[in-house]
């Protein structure tokens, strides 16, 4: 197949598996609705400096990630595609970086293509590409900073070296504006030991200053602007989002230190069967500069994230590009040698996983059906399992010819699985679809009320309003609600009837509740019985009409 044909086929696959599904399912709570609403508020209100969630100060992240999601909504509309396109673009650019870095390291087109394809089809990378959060963007900036570092170190001229270090600084600056100080730390974790090993520490000190200057030029305008606007921003952001998450006893998402070790194997499905051979080859080539650089990039950030108390699966996404390159390099070496053992093992692993998933689905359907009168969704999930099994079987039977079969498994999974979710999951996790069904009833509401931040942000995004009052909930908006001018934005349970009576004299109220517990049912019971009510799964929408004093 010619290069032009390969590129055309990959572009078609990108459109079919990555772009088309973006509009086929609602926004998942809590992340997608949160980021959609924050960026929409920037777009509508014009405040590009201070992030606000539901109109309240929200200082958990800087602003660049919101800017990119807002840009997507500005260009493509305030819709599902517009909210998610930033993640797809960031992922596509990271795939391109994988290709370019592999080409620079090994100067072999086949290896470059294999590395890019593996990275694009890693389960964690592909799955996050259609999900509106900040991790794909942050991962791209970290990837760009370290690719720029290698280009600077491998440059043949002073001009190219200056360009590489400058690009490194710009990428660190944008990464900082996306997710914070980690964007500076991760490149240092790799650059410092690598350049000490190469005995190039003077170069690190000299050119590193240029990278720091470039990063400051990117960061300082916003950093000073937000400090002038919100004097408490940096205190909260540094201590709450960095120190507390890393070392605090009450850190969010606390996990054991080994949490990421098995997760790393899961993250690179459907290629996990190649991990042992790739790591073994990396060990044999441990004195080669490219392998040392990639190993440091993989292992040191992984060790840092493992030491942190707070852990989420997506935190290790910056570690996956070097892993894809090590695996792609080992894969092509085995293809050239005609060694099919690792490929057969990977195919057998995927086939076994597909059969296990099929058996689990059959068991659940017989004992406690996951899908109830949902033949289309059940068909889609069977199609996903079938594609995974077919890819595994093909790679097991014809490992040297069908080595790329897992691509199909991964891409069918990300394209179809969101649409294959059971109705009870969709109803519970994508409340914006329920809101969209009742826009006519909601449009005239004077007040909005919700007992759940995910549902509240879905309501705000669909209605293009930030003024949702919180019903007996605070969550991650505890800090924003602590400001005196916003204390009325949250109504405790004891005051709800009085608040409803006063608010209804001013106009109608739309109340969106998620009912997941006895306390939620009690919240529902406290609402007046008049007006209209609509229910979908565990979501209840009540339209309470205006009353006269």
Curated annotation (Swiss-Prot):
One of the GO biological process terms: lipid A biosynthetic process
Superkingdom: Bacteria
Enzyme class per UniProt: transferase
GO cellular component: plasma membrane
Keyword Glycosyltransferase: yes
EC number(s) given by UniProt: 2.4.2.43
Keywords: Cell inner membrane, Cell membrane, Glycosyltransferase, Lipid A biosynthesis, Lipid biosynthesis, Lipid metabolism, Lipopolysaccharide biosynthesis, Membrane, Transferase, Transmembrane, Transmembrane helix
Residues that span the membrane, as ranges: 9-29, 80-100, 112-132, 136-156, 176-196, 204-224, 256-276, 288-308, 312-332, 346-366, 376-396, 402-422
Membrane topology qualifier: Multi-pass membrane protein
Pathway per the UniProt entry: Lipopolysaccharide metabolism; 4-amino-4-deoxy-beta-L-arabinose-lipid A biosynthesis
Keyword field contains Iron: no
UniProt subcellular location: Cell inner membrane
Pfam family, one: PMT
Any one GO molecular function term: pentosyltransferase activity
Catalytic activity line of the entry: 4-amino-4-deoxy-alpha-L-arabinopyranosyl di-trans,octa-cis-undecaprenyl phosphate + lipid IVA = lipid IIA + di-trans,octa-cis-undecaprenyl phosphate
InterPro entries named among the record's database cross-references: ArnT_tfrase (IPR022839), Glyco_trans_39/83 (IPR003342), LipidA_mod_glycosyltrf_83 (IPR050297)
Primary location: membrane
Similarity comment text for this entry: Belongs to the glycosyltransferase 83 family.
Known function: Catalyzes the transfer of the L-Ara4N moiety of the glycolipid undecaprenyl phosphate-alpha-L-Ara4N to lipid A. The modified arabinose is attached to lipid A and is required for resistance to polymyxin and cationic antimicrobial peptides.
Name under which the protein is recorded: Undecaprenyl phosphate-alpha-4-amino-4-deoxy-L-arabinose arabinosyl transferase
Species in which this protein is naturally found: Pseudomonas aeruginosa (strain ATCC 15692 / DSM 22644 / CIP 104116 / JCM 14847 / LMG 12228 / 1C / PRS 101 / PAO1)
Species lineage: Bacteria, Pseudomonadati, Pseudomonadota, Gammaproteobacteria, Pseudomonadales
